[in-house]
Amino acid sequence: MARLNVNPTRMELSKLKSKLVSARRGHKLLKDKRDELMRQFMNLIKENRQLRIEVEQAISEANRYMAVAGSVMQREVLETALMLPKQEVELQVNEKNVMSVYIPMFIPNYRTSDNNDIYSYGTAFTSIDLDGAVGALSEVFPKMIRLAEVEKACQLLADEIEKTRRRVNALEHIMIPDYEETIKFITMKLSENERSTTTSLMKVKDMVLRQSHSYK
């Protein structure tokens, strides 16, 4: 806490009181923002944890299917079957405003109207395990997109929470105490000046009265 270097005048006192009101209002708004950001951040962390578990399980399942398919199919046949994908996806990136933080939103646009039309090969020379691998990856793909959204959102919200926390602390521990200390000092100085002025006026009054009595 430090007193600001300002002149102890009534005008400065009025300015500082207005700044103190604004600082307190800003402090409350920033605390509310920080608390809401923390609430949304914790919800996203919970969702991120669950999504990661589901995605990792699905990828492990797809890897198991692919390992079996690779063991029963010739390498050339397997590579040919997967060479030309049946389904193509284009990601559209939008943004969502969360407490002045712009969170990316990934919207998949599929080439065909049927999202389940994923197999680009016939079944005569391929293993059913290959179907399982492709199906598992196709099923988990939307979750992978959502996981990317959530992880980026967590990163952006964490950065904003830290910025907001620093601003709250600066107001709470530096600016507001400095304003309060300076207002207290100026108020005290003005009171001292007022008492000094009153004392001087009383002395002048006494002198005038004494002089008036001496002329009688």
Give the location of each predicted region.
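Charge-rich amphipathic alpha-helical interaction elements
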Residues: 1-216
